[in-house]
Every structure is written in C-alpha cells, then in structure tokens.
Amino acid sequence: MKTRIIIVLCLTFGMIAGAEAQQADTLMKLVLEQNRELKVAREAYQVSILEAGIGNTPADPEVEFAYLYGKPSDLGNRIDFGVTQQLDFPTAYIHRSKVKNIKISRAELEYLLTRQEVLLAARQLWIEQIHLNQLQTLLSERLQQAETIRTHVEHQLEAGEVGLLEVSQSRLMLASLEGEYEEVLALLENNRMALIEISGGTQVEIKDTRFPQPVPMIPDTLLEAYRQGPYAQLYHQGLQLKEEEKNLAVSNHLPKLMAGYFSESVLDVAFRGFRLGVSVPLWENANTVKRAKSEVAYAEAAVDRYTYQQDREVRQNLKKLETLQLRVNKLEKAFGSANSLSLLAFAMENGEISLSEYFYTSDFYFRNQQQLLRYKRDLLIQEAELLKVYL
C-alpha cells in the first residue's frame, strides 16, 4: 500500500517542488485517509470478503432420536438414534474455494477502482484550484490597469482632451472586469467546498499559481498499463469467475454423498452400525450447466469488447492530449512576441494609440491569456485522466 501511494504521488505531482509539492502531497494524503467514499468502499470490501466465504462449508449434520412405545407392552420400547452428514461431490468444494478467492480479488479491484476515481477527482479539483488562482491574479492585474485607464480618461475629460464616449468605454470595461472577477471568486468558493468535501471535511488551503509540468507520455507503455490495470483485471477475473462457476455447476450436478451412524434398541436387542447413501442426479440442477456455459461465452465477448474499446479510448485521449499541447505551444510562442498590457497602457497614455485601439487590443490580449490558461488546465486534466491507471 505504501509503495502504491508513493507511485501515485510521484506520477501525479512529479514535476513540482517546494511548497506546491507539499500542498499537493497533503491533499492526497488527506483524501486517502479521510474521504468518506473511500471509508465506505473499505467497509464494503470487508463485507465482500465475508460474503465470499458464505456457502463454502458442508451442510449441517442431522441428528435423529426416536422413542417408540411398544404395544402390547411385552414387546418393550424401541429407541432409535442416528447422525447423518450429507456432502456434495468433493470437487464442488474445490471449485467453491476458487470462486471465493476470485470474488475476494474482484472486491479488492472494485475498491482500487473507487480509489482511482476519488484520487482523480481530487487531482482535478487541485488543477482547477490552480487555474482559478491564476485567473484571480490575472483579473486583479487587469482590474488595476482598467482602474488606471479610467482615472486617466476622466482626467483627460476634465482637460477637454476626450469626450464622454471614451469615459463610458473605460467605465464599461471596468464594470465588465469586476463582474468576471466576482464570478471567479464564486467559482473559487465552490471549488474550495468541493475540496473540503473530498478531503473528509478537512480545510485545505491551496494557494498554488503554477501548474506542474506535463508528464512525458509513452503510448505503448501506457497502453500496456491499461491492459494490466484494475478495469482490465476486473473483466478478466469476471471471465475466470464464470468459468469456475461453470465447473461448480458441473460438480453440483454430480451425485451427493451421505454417511452416518444409526442405532436401534428394543429390550435387550440392539442394532448399531453405519449407513451410506448417494443421490441420483435427475432434475434438481437441470439446465444449470448450460446456463453457466452461456455465461462464460458472454464473459469472453465482454472481455474482447472492453479490450478493444479501452485501447481506442486511450489512443483518442493521447491524440487529444497532443492537440492540447500544440495549442499551448502556439499560444505561448505568440505571447512571446506580443506586446504586454502594460506596454499598451503606456502607449495609450502617451497618445501613441487611441483609446478604442487600446480597448480592442488589450481585450484581445486578455482573452487569449485566459484561453492559454484554459488550455493548460485542460491539458493537465486530460493527463490526469490518462494517468489514473497508476493510482
């Protein structure tokens, strides 16, 4: 378990350091220890272990006692006593034991899958929190610039250098940005509540404003990890379970055995000894073997379908990840050669560009900054979805 947690943390948060890594590590540990859904899943796993062992033992023995009064009394009284144990055919217990082990293994896989989804959700909330922190910082800077521009334009109005239209434009821009800022604050609060819920009610403070570096992907290695992952194992073990249930159905159709001790006493005469019996398999388990064989065929088809769908989905997600990375690279390259908002504001204040040009250009620049942050967020969320197989 400890080794798995270390792998989770390394793969999930691998390329960040310092306080950011500590915050991420704290969140994941809290989720593993305090998350309510995981607590329920652990208890469900224990219940499944106990359920898997039910019905794997022989039936209870039967004890008989009879006291019969004789008539006429000269015959004396008759006392009968017997102990009988019925057993299924021996191979049935072998197959029941195998079925039990497979069910326990599947219960563990189901817990691991639940843990995967919970840790993935925690990872995605962490990424979203960083994204919202970045948006808050970006909007704060943008608001400061808009406030400066509005003040500058109002001074120009007093000096008669601009008209009311320019003042209205500057005020409209400021009001629009204030609305966006309030929306981001609301989203931050919603995300904070979601983080508290997923960490079992514990307050989690995430102030990160830097995304972790993307983890390099090796498609063949990732595909193999999915083929050996919990979902794939669950399907393969489902097939194994149906095969063992088929073998068990065959064993249950074989004769049942009965052995016991019996005694009969009348006056001074007593008979004691053992008795054996065997059932005649006729109609009690009719069609159960045919049904079990049909279920095996169904499970084989389900494994084949899942394997194909899983490979296709992984390849599609890898392609989507590659597309997002290209978008990020293009925008980052474009921003490297673009004028910053502070330079635009300086140019406007010095009369190098008009107020309308500043509004259009700065808004275009700002919207693309937001788009870049969204691309980076989507990239990391897609990456987290792909890497959940290692959780």
Predicted regions and their residues:
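Bacterial Sec-dependent N-terminal signal peptides
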Residues: 1-26, 32, 391
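Bacterial Sec-pathway N-terminal export signals of envelope proteins
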Residues: 19-62, 87, 95, 161-165, ...
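Surface positions of alpha-helical coiled-coils, especially the charged/polar e/g heptad sites
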Residues: 23, 30, 37, 89, ...
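Charged, solvent-exposed structural "stalk/scaffold" segments
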Residues: 23, 134-183, 197, 326-378, ...
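A small-residue-enriched
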Residues: 29-89, 226-290, 294-300, 311-314, ...
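Sec/SRP-type N-terminal targeting helices
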Residues: 39-43, 56, 88-118, 165, ...
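Periplasmic alpha-helical coiled-coil/stalk elements that build and connect Gram-negative outer-membrane
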Residues: 117-230, 317-320, 324
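Long amphipathic alpha-helical coiled-coil segments
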Residues: 194-203, 241-244, 248, 302-305, ...
